[in-house]
């Protein structure tokens, strides 16, 4: 629905044109593709049929079956890991964020139909811990189980959970480099007797704020909708200048703007439903295999999850600051989770562009990135 050219065949366009869309759409909502088909018209990067609450007007005005095939697949994505296709949901969908509707495991027919129509994205590269040590699918599963268990822990702040998981991967990387793959089981066994708080404390060490700013600026720069005249490089430097206090930081997804100094005075302490939401969003990206896609190593893939978490953190605080509040509310967190899915996890042009993804991957290879992000957000250095 956002930033994608959505292809529609001529028969579907003819069917949709029988409905009067003039109440919401100015002009023809369909753009010829020059090959006999069409694209859905985009305005400011959004499909013209996408309502302000991110719900599809074709679905609400007509029926689900009247939507183009690619739209019917939303919010489902599939990752093929080995011979298994894992389904995951996009949190850009408001129903997913609200946890509305039937559980996905009760919708087997829809899953099978959508998988057949939309297909999956398979991993072709061997699994790697850190780009150096090749590991098996079984070893990946054992590491993932520990990470998911920690991320789901309701008694520790999410930042501690993220730091503990990042520290686990850092330890695995250093130990396997020294003694080989036998260190994997030794490390996983050793952390069973340690608390998340203890491991997270180790994970905060050696984090340099300077290592985080460039990564965040790349992803947050996609969201400066009010600066659409700028190139991607220009948007990157806009975020960098905002972090230096030279201008306000803008977010199109949050419809907000505030100085970085005001943003850092906002407390990001999700509770109740908002804590459950952002935990569910983060856990789903790991458990569903999103972090294992492409050629990413486990370290790089988890760092993508780290970036997603801190984008949620920053954007929620930005919206609160723009409204003069000192703490984030549920709406701040909900909209930030939706934005992170758009900017980082599922729909980011940066991820789907091979050139920019290679550049980003090189920045996401550091085992210290989570510690750097934590230090950066706390504002000890810009």
Segments (PLM) and residue ranges:
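Hydrophobic, aromatic-lined core segments that form the binding pocket/scaffold
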Residues: 144, 149-382
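Internal, well-ordered alpha/beta segment that forms a basic, Gly-enriched binding/recognition surface
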Residues: 62-160
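General structural signal for secondary-structure boundaries
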Residues: 7-11, 96-104, 135-140, 329-336, ...
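N-terminal cysteine/histidine-rich coordination modules
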Residues: 1-49, 64, 73-105, 109, ...
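Conserved catalytic micro-motifs used in adenylation/nucleotidyl-transfer and phosphoryl/amide-
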Residues: 48-59
């Amino acid at each position: 629905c956002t930033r994608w050219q959505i292809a529609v065949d001529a028969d579907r366009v003819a069917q949709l044109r029988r409905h009067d869309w003039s109440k919401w759409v100015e002009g023809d909502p369909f753009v010829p593709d020059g090959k006999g088909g069409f694209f859905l018209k985009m305005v400011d990067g959004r499909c013209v049929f996408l309502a302000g609450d991110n719900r599809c007007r074709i679905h609400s005005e007509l029926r689900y079956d009247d939507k183009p095939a690619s739209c019917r697949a939303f919010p489902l994505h599939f990752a093929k890991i080995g011979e298994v296709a894992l389904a995951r949901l996009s949190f850009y969908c408001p129903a997913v964020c609200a946890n509305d509707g039937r559980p996905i495991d009760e919708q087997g027919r829809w899953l099978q139909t959508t998988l057949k129509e939309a297909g999956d994205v398979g991993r072709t590269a061997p699994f790697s811990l850190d780009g150096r040590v090749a590991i098996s699918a079984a070893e990946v599963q054992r590491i993932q189980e520990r990470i998911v268990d920690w991320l789901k822990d309701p008694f520790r702040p999410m930042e501690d959970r993220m730091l503990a998981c990042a520290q686990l991967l850092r330890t695995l990387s250093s130990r396997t480099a020294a003694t080989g793959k036998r260190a994997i089981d030794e490390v996983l066994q050793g952390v069973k007797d340690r608390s998340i708080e203890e491991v997270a404390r180790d994970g905060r060490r050696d984090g340099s704020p300077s290592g985080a700013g460039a990564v965040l600026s790349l992803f947050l720069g996609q969201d400066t909708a009010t600066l659409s005249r700028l190139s991607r490089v220009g948007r990157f430097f806009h975020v960098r200048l905002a972090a230096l206090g030279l201008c306000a930081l803008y977010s199109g997804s949050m419809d907000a703007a505030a100085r970085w100094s005001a943003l850092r005075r906002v407390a990001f302490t999700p509770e109740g439903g908002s804590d459950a939401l952002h935990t569910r969003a983060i856990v789903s990206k790991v458990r569903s295999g999103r972090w294992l896609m492409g050629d990413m190593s486990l370290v790089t893939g988890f760092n993508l999850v780290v970036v997603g978490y801190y984008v949620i953190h920053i954007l929620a605080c930005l919206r609160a600051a723009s409204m003069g509040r000192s703490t984030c509310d549920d709406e701040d967190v909900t909209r930030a989770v939706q934005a992170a899915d758009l900017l980082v996890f599922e729909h980011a042009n940066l991820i789907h562009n091979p050139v920019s993804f290679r550049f980003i991957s090189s920045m996401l290879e550091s085992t210290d990135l989570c510690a750097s992000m934590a230090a950066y957000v706390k504002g000890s250095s810009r």
